[in-house]
Amino acid sequence: MLRWLLLKLIRFYQVAISPWTPPSCIYTPTCSHYGYEAIQKYGALRGGWMTIKRIARCHPFARGGYDPVP
């Protein structure tokens, strides 16, 4: 249930909010795609924690680049 809710929230962000904001993620795949994949693969708790850590790393002073879900 929590997994389903988090995936729906991420999808809502991707469809309704993200198109209206300038691109700012320095990673590939983007943080929202990373979060969706991580939660799908590892579940709400572990995937959610991985997503939080990824978003915390996404700032202008980071290297960025290719960073897939392990």
Swiss-Prot record:
GO cellular component terms given for this protein: plasma membrane
Source species, domain of life: Bacteria
Protein location: Cell membrane
A Pfam family assignment: YidD
Membrane topology: Peripheral membrane protein
Keywords: Cell membrane, Membrane
Similarity comment: Belongs to the UPF0161 family.
General function of this protein: Could be involved in insertion of integral membrane proteins into the membrane.
Protein name: Putative membrane protein insertion efficiency factor
Species annotation: Chloroflexus aggregans (strain MD-66 / DSM 9485)
Lineage of origin: Bacteria, Bacillati, Chloroflexota, Chloroflexia, Chloroflexales
